[in-house]
């Protein structure tokens, strides 16, 4: 008797996400950009709090730090700079999406792209924009969006709101 998985079920990963927030900056850029997201309950997701009941920081990218691997004696670099947040569920109310220039290696501004997508029942774009960060500690509100009781985005704006200041001295 041999137990084998059905071929059509191998490698299947059931991931649940209602919204995806993607923050990216130029490939191979050494700076560390962070995403901070506040949900309607006031919980803030960021690199020190990677999981709430509603949101998860799927990828925390630190620029070029730890982007090299040795595979078969060859040094391989991952050029992609990207942070990803999944909203596995949603709570009605306002969400705030901020980007933070956590570590800078150059004086030139870094263009940071923020994209918010609603995934269900079909993929739709909630927000897309590019923001320039030009110094360590610079925090910018990319988007604030409100979800109604059915999970539909009803309004989007970029009225500034600091989330870092709410996190206290640890930040």
Q: Which role does the model predict for each range below?
A:
Residues 1-171:
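Intrinsic-disorder/low-complexity signal
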């Amino acid at each position: 008797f041999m137990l084998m998985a059905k071929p059509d079920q191998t490698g299947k990963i059931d991931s649940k996400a209602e919204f995806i927030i993607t923050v990216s900056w130029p490939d191979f850029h050494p700076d560390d950009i962070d995403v901070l997201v506040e949900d309607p309950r006031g919980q803030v997701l960021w690199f020190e709090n990677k999981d709430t009941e509603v949101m998860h920081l799927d990828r925390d990218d630190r620029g070029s730090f730890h982007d090299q691997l040795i595979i078969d004696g060859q040094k391989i670099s991952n050029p992609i700079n990207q942070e990803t947040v999944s909203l596995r569920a949603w709570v009605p109310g306002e969400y705030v999406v901020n980007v933070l220039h956590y570590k800078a290696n150059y004086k030139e501004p870094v263009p940071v792209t923020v994209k918010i997508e609603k995934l269900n029942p079909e993929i739709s774009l909630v927000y897309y924009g590019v923001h320039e960060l030009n110094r360590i500690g610079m925090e910018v509100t990319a988007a604030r969006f409100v979800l109604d009781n059915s999970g539909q985005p009803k309004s989007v704006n970029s009225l500034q709101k600091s989330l870092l200041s709410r996190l206290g001295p640890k930040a």
